[in-house]
Every structure is written in structure tokens, then in C-alpha cells.
From Swiss-Prot:
Residue positions where Phosphothreonine is found in the record: T129, T147
Taxonomic placement: Eukaryota, Metazoa, Chordata, Craniata, Vertebrata
Gene behind the chain: EEF1D
Source organism (scientific name): Macaca fascicularis (Crab-eating macaque)
CDD domains listed in its UniProt record: EF1B
Modification N-acetylalanine occurs at: A2
Protein name: Elongation factor 1-delta
Length: 281
């Protein structure tokens, strides 16, 4: 009775094996990739687990094929078939992953080979440059000092000496002629004479002084370089007027002191002389 009860009971006794196989599979999928050999070992372990599970299923099916087996439910067999199918699918996917890893490893190896070939150690050495020594500078041969005999011979031969002397004489004469002409031209040119315009104030003694006679006395002064100009009578005050007269003088010949001395000589009419304005021309 106890055996028949266990046969009809839906208990999966080998579930821990499938759990272990599934755990190892996901550990291999999520863990670090150590190489193609490690992946192949994991795949072989899964395959062995699947084969062992198949054997156990077959044994369990053979055990339930005895008397009373037909009365057992068919749901267990369908679940086992579905589970086996899923494991086969996972097996195929795992094989694809292993193949992709192998291809990636082969590509990495090819890349490493290319990098090793292109490294400086494998490069061809550059051709050595030849050392060229600098060229020695060739010094020109030193000239031998001329002997006194050769100097005498050179002095004796003068093909154009006479012509040079004649040209020097002509150039000297031409230079003297031009200097003489320049001196004559400069002598004929009138020299600039410095002149000044002076405005004088001649004051009488009083209002009874004859201003016409005073002006005549002033204009009677004749000096070399003196030219008298316009004049006028300017009232001073109290009926007294002063004579304001303009003159142009050459600075080298006539000075203001000389003019004052000459005008003040007329003591009867002139009291004083002042310079009202002085301008250079």
C-alpha cells in the first residue's frame, strides 16, 4: 500500500540535480570568461547532468510501467518532456555562446599578432647615415712680395701718365674759374642792411615855443643812414604840444644815442627827447 501511494504521488525526487545544473549554467553565463576550455568543461558537465537526468527518467518510467502504472496520471510525463525540451534548447544556446566566444578569442589572437608585428622591436631598422666630414677650406696661395727690380720696371712704364697730369691741370683751372665767378657774383649782390623804424617824442620848454621852428631844427639833422618821415603835433596839457616824428635808420650807421645828442643840441627849443616806439624792419 505504501509503494502504491508513492507511485501515485506527484513528487520530483531528482529536482535538486536539475537545480544544481541550472545554477552552474547561470554561473557560467554570468561569471567572468576564463577561456574557451572552461566554457567547454561547463558545457560537458551540463550535458552529463542532462544524460543522467534522462537515465533517471527512464528508470522512473520503467518502475512505473508495472501493475497499477496505467492508473497514474499522465501529467508527470508531459512535465518531464517539457523540461527535457527546455534543457535541450538551453544546451543549443550554450553551444552558440561557446562558438561566439571561440570566434572572439581567435579575433583577439589575430589582433595581438598584428600588434606584435607592428611593435618597434619588429620594425626594420633605418639605414645608417654616413658621416660626412666637413670640407677643409683651401687657403689661396700667398702672394710673393714684389722685388725692388719689378717695382722699378713698373715705375718706368707709364702709358697714361701724361694724360692724367693734363686732366688734373684742366680740372684745377676750371675749379679756380668757378670760384672766381662765384666771388664776383657775391660781391655784386647787395648786402642786406639792418634797419629800424623809430618814433621820437620831442618836447618843448613851454607853450610859447615855436613848434614849426623846432621841427625845422630836427629835420635839419642829416646823417648817413638817416631818413626822416612823417610828423605831427600831439597835445600834452596846459596848451603845450610835443612833436612826434618818425625816422628810419640803418643800425650799423645811426644809433638812438646819436639821434638824442643831435636833437638836444637845439637847447633853445628842445627840452627832452624820448623814444616812443622802436621796430626792426
Amino acid at each position: 500500500m505504501a509503494t502504491n501511494f508513492l507511485v501515485h504521488e506527484k513528487i520530483w525526487f531528482d529536482k535538486f540535480k536539475y537545480d544544481d545544473a541550472e545554477r552552474r549554467f547561470y554561473e557560467q553565463m554570468n561569471g567572468p570568461v576564463a577561456g574557451a576550455s572552461r566554457q567547454e568543461n561547463g558545457a560537458s558537465v551540463i550535458l552529463r547532468d542532462i544524460a543522467r537526468a534522462r537515465e533517471n527518467i527512464q528508470k522512473s518510467l520503467a518502475g512505473t510501467s508495472g501493475p497499477g502504472a496505467s492508473s497514474g496520471p499522465s501529467g508527470d510525463h508531459s512535465e518531464l518532456v517539457v523540461r527535457i525540451a527546455s534543457l535541450e534548447v538551453e544546451n543549443q544556446s550554450l553551444r552558440g555562446v561557446v562558438q561566439e566566444l571561440q570566434q572572439a578569442i581567435s579575433k583577439l589572437e589575430a589582433r595581438l599578432n598584428v600588434l606584435e608585428k607592428s611593435s618597434p622591436g619588429h620594425r626594420a631598422t633605418a639605414p645608417q647615415t654616413q658621416h660626412v666630414s666637413p670640407m677643409r677650406q683651401v687657403e689661396p696661395p700667398a702672394k710673393k712680395p714684389a722685388t725692388p727690380a719689378e717695382d722699378d720696371e713698373d715705375d718706368d712704364i707709364d702709358l697714361f701718365g701724361s694724360d692724367n697730369e693734363e686732366e688734373d691741370k684742366e680740372a684745377a683751372q676750371l675749379r679756380e674759374e668757378r670760384l672766381r665767378q662765384y666771388a664776383e657774383k657775391k660781391a655784386k649782390k647787395p648786402a642786406l642792411v639792418a634797419k629800424s623804424s623809430i618814433l621820437l617824442d620831442v618836447k618843448p620848454w613851454d607853450d610859447e615855443t615855436d613848434m614849426a621852428q623846432l621841427e625845422a631844427c630836427v629835420r635839419s639833422i642829416q646823417l648817413d643812414g638817416l631818413v626822416w618821415g612823417a610828423s605831427k603835433l600831439v597835445p600834452v596839457g596846459y596848451g603845450i604840444r610835443k612833436l612826434q616824428i618818425q625816422c628810419v635808420v640803418e643800425d650799423d650807421k645811426v644809433g638812438t644815442d646819436l639821434l638824442e645828442e643831435e636833437i638836444t643840441k637845439f637847447e633853445e627849443h628842445v627840452q627832452s627827447v624820448d623814444i616812443a616806439a622802436f621796430n626792426k624792419i
